[in-house]
Amino acid sequence: MNKLKTRVLGIRLAAISVVVMTCVMIPGGQAQTVIDEWATAELPPPPALKPVTIVPAETALLVMDFTTQTCSAKRRPRCAVSVPKVQKLVAESRAKGALVIYSVAVPGSVATDILKDLTPAAGELVLPPLGPDKFINSDLEQILKGKGIKTVVALGTQAQTSVLHTGAAAALRGFNVIVPVDGMSSDAVFPELYTAWHLSTAARISARVTLTRLDLIGY
């Protein structure tokens, strides 16, 4: 009797497997993938933007890759639109004593390639082209911790590269991360959406990330 029950159970499980496989097949016999579902996927609700108050002596602005090669009305118009507001935040934060650190992205680019409106002040660090994560192959972590920095504000022309990867890397290193969504940009809207979603939901990262707007940052 037990053998019969076992056999019946096995048949039922096999039948269920067939049904499941049938449900995830598409015409042609290939398994359904996220790519097949791309056009019908629903966007998650937008993350909340929160007002933040920064302590200048414990805060560093990471002004990443705002250069003539990457940020212009022709090359990346969404970046060009963000520059005046980013400039205002940088000027105010610098005047209040916050640390400002720059980076350039394109191989061969130097500090003089940074946009005129965001020109570094004398003595401000400019990181060379390092790739998406500005902590890799640099002394950025040691510099920040050596100056008592607890919070970084991630600003950048390439949301899905420098802002996403440097912001996540900072969070994983124990820094609080502020991301003004109007201070990051890309070639299109989706990379900005993805960056905001990832930073606000990823395990071990989201707990240290605050999404905000530039006009919601106070001192």
Locate predicted features:
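Bacterial N-terminal signal peptides that target proteins for export
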Residues: N2-I16
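Residue-identity detector for glycine
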Residues: G10, G28-G29
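Bacterial N-terminal signal peptides
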Residues: A14-V24
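Active-site-adjacent betaalpha module
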Residues: Q30-A60, G108-Y219
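Acidic/histidine-rich helix-loop elements
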Residues: T33-T40, C71-A80
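Acidic/histidine-rich, surface-exposed loop or edge segments in extracytoplasmic proteins
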Residues: L62-A73
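Short beta-strand segments at enzyme active-site cores
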Residues: V63-M64, A98-A105, P180
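A short alpha/beta connector and helix-capping loop motif
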Residues: R75-S93, A98-I101
